[in-house]
Amino acid sequence: MAEWKIYTPEGVQDILQNECFFKKNLEDRIRKVFRASGYYEVETPIVEFYDVFSTEENIIPQETMFKFFDQQGRILVLRPDLTIPIARVAATKLKDAAYPLRISYIGNAFKYNELGGGKQKEFTQAGVEIIGVNTPEADAEVIATAIDAVKATGLENFQIDIGQVEFFKGLMEETGLSEEETEKMRVLIDRKDFLGIEELVEEHNIRDDLKELILDFPKLFGSTDVIDRVEKYPINERSIKALNNLRSIINILDDYGLSKYVSVDLGMVQSLNYYSGTIFRGFTYGVGFPILSGGRYDRLVEKFGKSSPATGFSMGINMVMMALDRQKVEFEKPRVDTLVCYREEGRKTAFQICETLRKQGLAVEVDINGGDFETARNYAALKGIGGILKVLDDENIEIHNLEKGEVSKVTISELLKA
């Protein structure tokens, strides 16, 4: 159908000059944060085997993936996530590297009905992974790096909510709920469905103090006082260990000087089959979805043949861009500093001037409209170029300051000295 050739499919889009400049600038800022903290960037293929993302835990539902076949009939996918391919690389090509591994990435992923961002099917993720260490220091470093990355984007009003999935799992052990009922409880708590939680609790013979704690679960968020409050209950060793781990991480973040960005949310219980300890999400106003998420996933790398603990986070670049736009955060826009025009006899000189100015860090365009100055002037005004250098001959130049409406003449040597 020929009429579709001028459109893009639903969920993908062209990114035009200003927005693309903005996006690449954002990625560069984030990349500098990662590199400054010792993370080395890797790239994994956009196309992967379906088996890489197919797990018994159904971490990424198969119906959300873009699937197709290769020439041998094997199922391929456009990667729906970047963390899982990093785990594959760590367990195979980097299995003999010095541990802990600090890996970073920035790349596009593809998924049907991606949460947030207008249901985009193509989106950009940036993140880091620490592989090979299971310590509170590693988890705290990942969270600190996430905070530094958000700050580098220009966002100032944001919050990182931190939870611990082992705390929930420990409580569920005490209740005697089946796996199916535990999953049902997880969903109810994640949705903060108080009525549903109460109904499920009343269906079982759960001791009163534990029942009280479970009913309070969706409200267990805020400052570190939440941990103090929960520790007063007679909880089991697994839950106590989880709370101690969480407190250690928060204390380390306090030493980083990042406490003001951090809050506790013990009701954060999504993806129990994926996360194995710390879990966190980042929020800012103007966007109804997390701008980043992460946590500890000690069982993922093992899927690819090497048992190794891991922790990391992923930031949604598109979500951050949306937040910056809605919060009216000013960002640098692409611009050309100077347009150089010339007559034929001054062409070589004009090119030499361009080269010199570019080495000085200026963005310089050469007029290619055929030498008509008025055409060049109108083009520069329309594009927002501040000035025009008109090369008259091998020695003399006219400087047209379009912002002030001023014209002056200088020699080439005078210009280059300035």
UniProtKB/Swiss-Prot annotation:
UniProt record, GO biological process: histidyl-tRNA aminoacylation; L-histidine biosynthetic process
Disulphide bridges: none
Organism, scientific name: Acetivibrio thermocellus (strain ATCC 27405 / DSM 1237 / JCM 9322 / NBRC 103400 / NCIMB 10682 / NRRL B-4536 / VPI 7372)
InterPro entries the UniProt entry points to: aa-tRNA-synth_II, aa-tRNA-synth_II/BPL/LPL, Anticodon-bd_dom_sf, HisRS-like_core, HisRS/HisZ, HisZ
Gene field: hisZ
Keywords: Amino-acid biosynthesis, Cytoplasm, Histidine biosynthesis
Name the record gives this protein: ATP phosphoribosyltransferase regulatory subunit
HAMAP family: HisZ (MF_00125)
Family from the record: Belongs to the class-II aminoacyl-tRNA synthetase family. HisZ subfamily.
Cellular localisation: Cytoplasm
Assembly, per entry: Heteromultimer composed of HisG and HisZ subunits.
GO molecular function: catalytic activity, acting on a protein; histidine-tRNA ligase activity; transferase activity
Note: This function is generally fulfilled by the C-terminal part of HisG, which is missing in some bacteria such as this one.
GO cellular component: cytoplasm
Functional pathway: Amino-acid biosynthesis; L-histidine biosynthesis; L-histidine from 5-phospho-alpha-D-ribose 1-diphosphate: step 1/9
Top-level taxon of the source organism: Bacteria
Task of the protein: Required for the first step of histidine biosynthesis. May allow the feedback regulation of ATP phosphoribosyltransferase activity by histidine.
